[in-house]
């Protein structure tokens, strides 16, 4: 039986439009197979090679000073592309993130890299609009609707928002996942552990539903990462 691999993804940026020089400063992505979180994720803070506007800082709390010693996008691009390969991306307001990711990829000037396509993306914002016409569709509003604990979300953050979105997405599609412990600010450690997926194993269809022990280890792993801040 083939496995359904989905990547719940979020980014934080310096602004709203990459055509005005804005860049990605954080990527958070979490793997889900057959609607079960596997414990594999990808998380990096990224040096945008520019200043951090105060308006953006107020949203996510990531300062230019904090990002000075973080890697450039070009140094993590290959690992990121490997992590999301052969999967459907789950994103809230997908055009925004895809626009920024494709801009970052275009700056690499590598002809072998294919741009990301919205056709391979599920937009939870669109899902929510179709399911609940006239309601509020922000991530916070959907957390409230589905009773997902977002009490620690004073600031935006790519990894913690991806964790929240994972629960919201499962609720939107008829199921639930265990609750994650959220953080209040970005961690002050240079790029906490990144556990990338074995893409070849996924291709061979070897991925199976995690055991109870694996799920517990996953929860402890995510909690450890999110508590660091």
From Swiss-Prot:
Transmembrane segments: none annotated. Its cofactor is Mg(2+); Mn(2+). One of its GO terms (cellular component) is cytosol. A divalent metal cation 2 binds at residue 10. Substrate binds at residues 10, 12, 55, 60, 161. InterPro entries: DnaQ, DnaQ_proteo, Exonuclease_RNaseT/DNA_pol3, RNaseH-like_sf, RNaseH_sf. Its EC number is 2.7.7.7. The active site is at 156 (proton acceptor). GO terms for biological process: DNA replication proofreading. A divalent metal cation 1 binds at residues 10, 12, 161. Keywords: DNA replication, DNA-directed DNA polymerase, Exonuclease, Hydrolase, Magnesium, Manganese, Metal-binding, Nuclease, Nucleotidyltransferase, Transferase. It catalyses: DNA(n) + a 2'-deoxyribonucleoside 5'-triphosphate = DNA(n+1) + diphosphate. Binds 2 divalent metal cations. Magnesium or manganese. One of its GO terms (molecular function) is DNA-directed DNA polymerase activity. DNA polymerase III contains a core (composed of alpha, epsilon and theta chains) that associates with a tau subunit. This core dimerizes to form the POLIII' complex. PolIII' associates with the gamma complex (composed of gamma, delta, delta', psi and chi chains) and with the beta chain to form the complete DNA polymerase III complex. DNA polymerase III is a complex, multichain enzyme responsible for most of the replicative synthesis in bacteria. The epsilon subunit contain the editing function and is a proofreading 3'-5' exonuclease. This is DNA polymerase III subunit epsilon. It comes from Rickettsia prowazekii (strain Madrid E). The lineage of its organism: Bacteria, Pseudomonadati, Pseudomonadota, Alphaproteobacteria, Rickettsiales.
């Amino acid at each position: 039986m083939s496995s359904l691999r989905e990547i719940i993804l979020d980014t934080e940026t310096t602004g709203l439009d990459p055509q005005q020089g804005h860049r990605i400063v954080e990527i958070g992505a979490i793997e889900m197979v057959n609607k079960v979180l596997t414990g594999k994720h990808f998380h990096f803070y990224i040096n945008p090679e520019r200043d951090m506007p105060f308006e953006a800082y107020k949203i996510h709390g990531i300062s230019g000073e904090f990002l000075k010693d973080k890697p450039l996008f070009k140094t993590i691009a290959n690992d990121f592309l490997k992590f999301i390969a052969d999967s459907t991306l789950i994103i809230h307001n997908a055009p925004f993130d895809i626009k920024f990711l494709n801009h970052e990829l275009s700056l690499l000037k590598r002809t072998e890299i294919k741009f990301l396509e919205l056709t391979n993306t599920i937009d939870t914002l669109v899902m929510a609009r179709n399911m609940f016409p006239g309601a509020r569709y922000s991530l916070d509003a959907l957390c409230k609707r589905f009773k997902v604990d977002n009490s620690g979300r004073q600031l935006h953050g790519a990894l913690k928002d991806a964790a929240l979105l994972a629960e919201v997405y499962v609720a939107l599609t008829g199921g639930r996942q265990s609750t994650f412990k959220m953080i209040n600010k970005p961690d002050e450690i240079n790029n906490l552990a990144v556990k990338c997926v074995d893409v070849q194993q996924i291709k061979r269809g070897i991925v199976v539903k995690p055991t109870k022990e694996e799920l517990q280890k996953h929860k402890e792993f995510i909690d450890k990462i999110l508590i660091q801040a």
